[in-house]
């Protein structure tokens, strides 16, 4: 997120043109109140919603799947950015005066890039996981430990990418106010600044969206456009339907992110083409609207999960059960939905390889949690009743194979 704040300083053209001029971006009180209400909605909805998402996944063993760990990372990044940067962005954009000191100036320009990087590459990791599970079902899947390592690598790369902008951030005292700005090394045509901003835009927007778009296109063709050979039982179609729902949900999440951030990146690349853009009187209102849209991307995912996924909906209902207009629902579904799947897995082993190996991110008939209980031959004996010894052995071996490819 190059410039969420870096170029906040550029919003005031007098920073780079005439540091003795007073702040020319002043708006009536009623506009400030309306914008304040709009930004407050983002902070409250994002922080509360994403914290509930993290609780739903981490507090329920059946929800601790590999891909759900990436959703936890996504929720953490978005809640953090909403909590630490949205209000500061708003106050600085409205008053064009920095109240928070040098340290927070550096953090303010540094953290949003890291958070957006972590968010989009968490979505990329989910897309890659879906791609491998559906297109290459027999390939080894990430373990819980490997998933945590990937998340750590994402954050290390995010911090490295954001470091230059934080390092060169500084405050400057003017006759009537203090501003937070970025002092890039001197070079003709601001080459360092341009190269950095273009690289950041490519790395946190266009490149990951290209990868995600390819992955979900191939997955979509496989799940919707192709006739999948094998057993055509109701159980089989039920599982494929569940997988389609999850892919639809993640596509909505990615498209929402892309739509929210596109105007922001365009806004901060245009001045390299038209340097006088920030001198326009209307630019502050345009910036506030574009920044609100970008920041609002942090609050939509919990709403999407709640609307499109049954198990998240149960979790949200339980979290807000104290509200008079919300019914708690069957909270046990969060823990028990996977149990039925576990008990019946052996009996549906004969369906196609795709059915036994595709796993979903969340919802009924999902992948088993990495740290969840594993099925044992004895549990299969309970479902097969008085089967012969040879039948029991066959079912045990079949289930063992199925469990291996699902994990």
From Swiss-Prot:
Residue intervals annotated with topology Extracellular: 1-31, 87-106, 170-194, 271-283
Protein name: Substance-P receptor
Protein's UniProt keywords contain Cell membrane: yes
Record's keyword terms, sorted: Cell membrane, Disulfide bond, G-protein coupled receptor, Glycoprotein, Lipoprotein, Membrane, Palmitate, Receptor, Transducer, Transmembrane, Transmembrane helix
Annotated SUPFAM superfamilies: Family A G protein-coupled receptor-like
Disulfide-linked positions: 105-180
Segments of this protein annotated with the region Disordered: 364-407
Cytoplasmic side: 55-64, 129-148, 220-248, 309-407
One Gene Ontology CC term in the entry: plasma membrane
Membrane topology: Multi-pass membrane protein
List of glycosylated residues: 14, 18
Top-level taxon in the UniProt lineage: Eukaryota
Effect noted on mutating residue 192 to H: Display properties similar to those of the wild-type receptor
GO biological process, one term: response to estradiol
Positions of S-palmitoyl cysteine lipidation: 322
Places the protein is found: Cell membrane
InterPro entries: GPCR_Rhodpsn, GPCR_Rhodpsn_7TM, Neurokn_rcpt, NK1_rcpt
Assembly, per entry: Interacts with ARRB1.
Ranges annotated as spanning the membrane: 32-54, 65-86, 107-128, 149-169, 195-219, 249-270, 284-308
Known role: This is a receptor for the tachykinin neuropeptide substance P. It is probably associated with G proteins that activate a phosphatidylinositol-calcium second messenger system. The rank order of affinity of this receptor to tachykinins is: substance P > substance K > neuromedin-K.
Database matches in Pfam families: 7tm_1 (PF00001)
